[in-house]
Amino acid sequence: MRKNIIIITGGAGFVGSNLITLLLKLTKNKIISLDNYSSGTTKNHIKSKRVKYLKGNTKDVSKIFKNTKNINSIFHFGEFSRIYQSFKNMNDCIDSNSIGTNAVFNFCLRNDIKLIYSATSATLGNNGNDKNLSPYAF
């Protein structure tokens, strides 16, 4: 059986929705967006019979996707994406960026699913010469 499903975490965000548009042009795969809509929006939804949008958290990826046999790959863009908010909502930031990302990584490893991960520019800094300046960069 052909693995014909691509999952995009953060598919309702700017980067995720643009990736969905590109994948619709370049592939014949079905696409599933998993987004908690903390910064993504339904206005970014791409209308296509090949795209399905799910509201959920990356930390629950194993519960959400129980049938993995047709999943080809996961593009992981679903993270807490606002540096200034990471100070106000540190627990949400850690929950999404650390726990959620770990869940996605382990899900892919356990199920032999390709992972494409895009780290945040906030992880780039002063070449390690100073401490991380926000919880977002951890």
Describe each region flagged by the PLM.
Residues M1-F138:
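N-terminal Rossmann-like NAD(P)+-binding domain of SDR-like oxidoreductases, especially those catalyzing
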